[in-house]
């Protein structure tokens, strides 16, 4: 049986989670939502956010049977979330193909992308693709997003993931 894509994401306001919800059936993926980091050691609570998300116990076990791994996180003040960075400090991505989806107000976030890419590469991944997703449109607030906004962004990411999946055949 071929490996399935896995989306690992963090969502504080629900914008990233909504994109993931739309994306899941498009790429036939599973998803895991990262909880808030706890304690000084940055331990993670990874739990259910919807019926499609499965509860998992620890970061090392979750990626073995999946490929590619899609990492999605909001960008705040030009930086990826601390939750995603802390998660990447505790996971083995050796030889995994990784697609990074950054959700933010800007069309690009090179500083955030560079930090996330470096952290993923430190964990051994084969870095494949990135996509910048608009979580907020210029002059608007994240609460102004409509269904078509989420669909447009999910489609952008689905195209990137589909290209990675097609490349492996």
What is the predicted function of each stretch?
Residues 89-96, 121-123:
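Short, conserved loop/helix-junction motifs that constitute active-site signature segments
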Residues 1-72, 77-89, 152-169:
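N-terminal beta1-alpha1-beta2 submodule of the flavodoxin-like/Rossmannoid cofactor-binding fold
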Residues 65, 94, 126-127:
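Short loop/turn motifs at secondary-structure junctions
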Residues 15, 79-80, 108-112, 142:
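Secondary-structure boundary/capping motif
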Residues 99-137:
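Short, glycine-/small-residue-rich phosphate/pyrophosphate-handling segment
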Residues 83-87, 112-118, 146-147:
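Charged helix-capping and loop-helix junction motifs
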């Amino acid at each position: 049986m071929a490996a399935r894509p896995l989306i690992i994401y963090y969502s504080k306001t629900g914008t990233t989670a909504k994109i993931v919800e739309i994306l899941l059936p498009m790429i036939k993926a599973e998803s895991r939502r990262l909880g808030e980091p706890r304690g000084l050691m940055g331990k993670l609570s990874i739990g259910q956010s919807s019926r499609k998300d499965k509860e998992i116990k620890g970061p090392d076990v979750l990626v073995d049977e999946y490929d590619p791994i899609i990492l999605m996180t909001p960008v705040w003040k030009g930086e990826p979330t601390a939750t995603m960075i802390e998660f990447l400090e505790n996971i083995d991505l050796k030889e995994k193909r990784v697609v990074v989806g950054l959700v933010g107000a800007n069309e690009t976030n090179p500083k955030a992308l560079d930090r996330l890419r470096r952290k993923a590469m430190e964990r051994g991944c084969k870095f494949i693709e990135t996509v910048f997703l608009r979580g907020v449109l210029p002059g608007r607030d994240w609460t102004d997003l409509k269904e078509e906004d989420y669909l447009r962004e999910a489609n952008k990411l689905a195209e990137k993931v589909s290209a990675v999946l097609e490349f492996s055949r």
